A protein has these predicted regions:
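Extracellular zinc-dependent metalloprotease catalytic-domain scaffold
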Residues: 1-222, 231-365
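Conserved beta-strand->loop/alpha-helix structural units within folded catalytic cores of enzymes
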Residues: 226-227
Length: 365
């Protein structure tokens, strides 16, 4: 995940008190067009339009004040922040990926670099236009829903106008697809610098598991809505970036990077107990007696208010997160035992709903 995408200074975004409906822009990878016609029509004409419309009507954000120009991928994890912009060391990677999709050149910022000591910071000149066109012609993973405008050597990228979130969509039978009965999965790939909000993400449809039967449509649509929300904010990889109602971080930031501390083993940023807290029950009743049991709860203000009201329990610390299912399920969904058919639990249940609890979490991001 790439952070510190520069769009506007933080003080400008914080002062913009009126939120606007979320605007999502969709870009297809070539793999989507290679699907059989019935599956392409399902995605293009029904599933994605309805899922995107649902979240655009349900969520509001501080309006993005200009085009989204995504950061280029650096060869290493180390970057320098200069003037609110991330700078790579000496060079940028030739390709910047978002999930299975190569981000188009005209969606990217220039290549900002510094030397290994953080000095001599500058914009690295792009490859000659002819070379870039040759690279694009050879790339089988580019987007082709419209032709990219030609870029001169000096011209800045156009970025993505009139949008708050860019969703790159692919349809590739990946290893993750083959692990189980996975219809689709999604995640964010870049966050803006001012408030850490995700501004780009990817969604991959698994062709082998994508059903076009009418009876399966509600299930597929619910799954895609669920996955898009992971990219928009409901994700353990974003917990450490949540902010309070004044736009201040809920997790302390490192002075050298401006980001929360990184868990090197899990490769995710560590959140504070103002976001997710480990709770221990000393007398957890089971058949035949009591045991000690620990679990993780979301303890942000609106979530606490909603979960206490839901269970009519004024002492409840927060909303419990799933503790089973391994990577991709545990800690990034609501606990199924408690929240049953809530759409953001880890397994699909008929008649799933997005409850006030999930919307409270999104408000607390």
């Amino acid at each position: 995940v790439i952070t510190n995408v520069h769009i506007e200074p933080a003080h400008r975004v914080k002062k913009r008190s009126i939120d606007q409906p979320l605007r999502i822009s969709i870009f297809y990878d070539h793999s989507v067009y290679r699907l059989e016609a019935t599956k392409f029509d399902l995605i293009n004409n029904t599933i994605l339009p309805e899922a995107v419309k649902f979240w655009e009507q349900a969520l509001k954000v501080r309006k993005t004040g200009g085009p989204i120009r995504l950061n280029r991928k650096c060869p290493t994890r180390q970057v320098f922040i200069r003037g609110s912009r991330a700078h790579c060391i000496d060079s940028c990677k030739a390709d910047t990926m978002c999930g299975e999709v190569k981000v188009p050149e005209h969606h990217l910022s220039p290549c900002y670099v510094c030397n290994s000591t953080g000095h001599d910071c500058r914009i690295l000149s792009p490859a000659p236009a002819a070379e870039r066109r040759a690279d694009n012609d050879d790339n089988g993973n580019a987007l082709n829903d419209y032709d990219a405008p030609p870029l001169s050597d000096e011209e800045d990228s156009t970025g993505v106008e009139d949008s708050d979130f860019v969703l790159y969509v692919s349809a590739v039978e990946t290893e993750r697809c083959r692990r189980g009965l996975t219809v689709a999965y999604a995640s964010h790939c870049q966050q803006e610098a001012a408030l850490d909000r995700p501004v780009a993400g990817h969604a991959n449809f698994c062709p082998g598991e994508l059903s076009t039967k009418y009876r399966d449509l509600p299930s597929v649509l619910a799954t895609v809505k669920h996955e898009i929300l992971h990219a928009l904010g409901f994700s353990m990889s974003l917990f450490a970036f949540y902010r309070d109602e004044n736009g201040e971080p809920l997790t302390e930031r490192r002075p050298d990077t401006g980001n929360p501390p990184l868990d090197e083993e899990l490769q995710i940023h560590k959140w504070s107990d103002r976001v997710v807290k480990n709770i221990t029950r000393n007398k957890w009743m089971i058949r035949g007696g009591y045991v000690e049991r620990s679990f993780n709860m979301v303890v942000t203000p609106r979530v606490v208010r909603e979960v206490r009201q839901h269970f009519n329990c004024s002492e409840l610390e927060g909303a419990e997160l799933e503790d089973q299912g391994g990577d991709g399920t545990a800690l990034t969904h609501w606990e199924k035992r408690l929240f049953e058919n809530e759409a953001m639990t880890g397994t699909h249940t008929q008649n799933s709903v997005f409850s006030r609890l999930t919307f409270a979490l999104m408000e607390d991001t």
